[in-house]
UniProtKB/Swiss-Prot annotation:
Disulfide bonds join 67-74, 72-375, 118-124, 279-302. UDP-alpha-D-glucose binds at residues 226-230, 234, 273-275, 291-295. Belongs to the glycosyltransferase 90 family. It is an enzyme of class 2 (transferase). Pathway: Protein modification; protein glycosylation. The record marks 120, 229, 256 as: Interaction with the consensus sequence C-X-S-X-[PA]-C in peptide substrates. It comes from the Eukaryota. Keywords: Disulfide bond, Endoplasmic reticulum, Glycoprotein, Glycosyltransferase, Secreted, Signal, Transferase. Pfam families: Glyco_transf_90 (PF05686). Its main location: endoplasmic reticulum. This is O-glucosyltransferase rumi homolog.
């Protein structure tokens, strides 16, 4: 029986016992209980906080329907939603007005062309890697692909909606999401990944291998985080780590903007930690960076319990991951006390933590394969191409890529 069902059964039983008028055969609180174990469990199953979290998990599971492992169907609704503002078609004027918001690409006669000046060459290269296999099957089209961290087209602007592709956004933006270049190359560059985090296909293998060597029973029952101080949203966890190092190991690393210990909350910068080495911990925290976190998808591969802070920033695959089903949601601005309560709840309910961790791993392993990323790119390009309502003429200021 799943751990959640056991917990719920005990909660119901305790309620029934506490409200029974028939005390025959029962050990009452004021009587000696020779046959009843003094401590049936290490956990107080009747705390209000326990009831709160169990109820949230129960509610999430009751409404959850697993998606099918075919044709990147888990993410189909995201593409439909993103393209809906352009159901009337994409005009040449719309693309021209959008040009300043990203890098211009053309597909003409199954060849790919790009404007000469790419702000982030590795990012453009990552994008082009996913476009290339689709060229033989695509109609002529023009695309404005934003390779910056930040989305571009605010939905509250009164101007015409413009078709700009971005890897990440919030609900305030109308950008069309595409799977980030970082699935192949051009992700965040740190000392451990000097050319930038990429090759999702390879990391899937290496991190899973590390996870296999750190079975749940062997993992350290600690919350873990390593990253730079891109925002103060991360401060409470780092401060909790300093106050309760037996519960949390969260430290700031140095980034390019680091000037003094103030930039790491008055502490010496910690060393960066390989993604594979995260797997030795049971609880892994994810925070947004400038936009959505490149770390997020990798954490699930450790088969550890992922605590995801904030729900504002999205990538194309985020909506398929459900809070309390695949990960533990944490509100932005959670205090040290709130974080401590949440971590301790799962430390006391180890089987429940493991069930969520397993579901998170299985979902990412089955529905965020490289073939799913390629599938999403294919569907995006084909459906976008059908919306283009003008004859695309070769722009000779662009350079041929493929």
């Amino acid at each position: 029986m799943p751990y959640l069902e056991i917990v719920l059964a005990l909660l119901v039983l305790s309620f029934q016992l506490g409200h029974s008028d028939d005390d025959s055969g029962m050990c009452m609180a004021k009587e000696p209980c020779s046959e009843a174990p003094q401590q049936e469990t290490k956990v107080d199953l009747y705390k209000a906080t326990d009831n709160k979290y169990v109820a949230l998990i129960q509610e999430a599971l009751a409404s959850y329907e697993p998606c099918q492992q075919a044709n990147c169907s888990c993410h189909a609704d995201v593409l439909k939603t993103d393209l809906r503002p352009f159901k009337g078609g994409i005009s040449e004027q719309m693309v021209e007005r959008a040009r300043s918001y990203g890098t211009k690409y053309q597909i003409v006669d199954h060849r790919l062309y790009r404007q000469k000046d790419c702000m982030f060459p590795a990012r453009c290269s990552g994008v082009e890697h996913f476009i290339k296999p689709n060229l033989p099957h695509l109609p002529d089209m023009e695309l404005i692909i934003n390779c910056r961290d930040w989305p571009q087209i605010n939905r509250h602007w009164k101007q015409e909606k413009l078709p700009v592709l971005s890897f990440s956004k919030t609900d305030d933006y109308l950008d069309i999401m595409y799977p980030t270049w970082g699935f192949w190359e051009g992700g965040p560059a740190i000392s451990l990944y000097p050319t930038g985090l990429g090759r999702w296909d390879q990391h899937r293998v290496s991190i899973k291998k590390a996870a296999d060597s750190w079975k749940w029973e062997k993992k350290k029952a600690k919350a873990f985080f390593r990253g730079s101080r891109t925002s103060d949203e991360r401060d409470p966890l780092v401060l909790l780590s300093r106050r309760k190092p037996e519960l949390v190991d969260a430290q700031y690393t140095k980034n390019q903007a680091w000037k003094s210990p103030k930039d790491t909350l008055n502490a010496k910068p910690a060393q960066e930690v390989r993604l594979e080495d995260h797997c030795q911990y049971k609880y892994l925290f994810n925070f947004r960076g400038v936009a959505a976190s490149f770390r997020f998808k990798h954490l699930f591969l450790c088969r550890s319990l992922v605590f995801h802070v904030g729900s504002e920033w999205q990538e194309f695959f985020y909506p398929s991951l459900k809070p309390w089903v695949h990960y533990v949601p944490v509100r932005v601005g959670a205090t040290q006390e709130e974080l401590e309560e949440l971590i301790e709840f799962f430390a006391e309910h180890d089987d429940l933590a493991r069930e969520i961790a397993d579901r998170g791993f299985e979902h990412v392993w089955k529905h965020l394969r490289m073939k799913d990323v390629e599938c999403y790119w294919r569907k995006l390009l084909r459906r976008y191409g059908k919306l283009v309502k003008y004859e695309v003429k070769r722009d000779h200021s662009l350079v041929e890529v493929y």
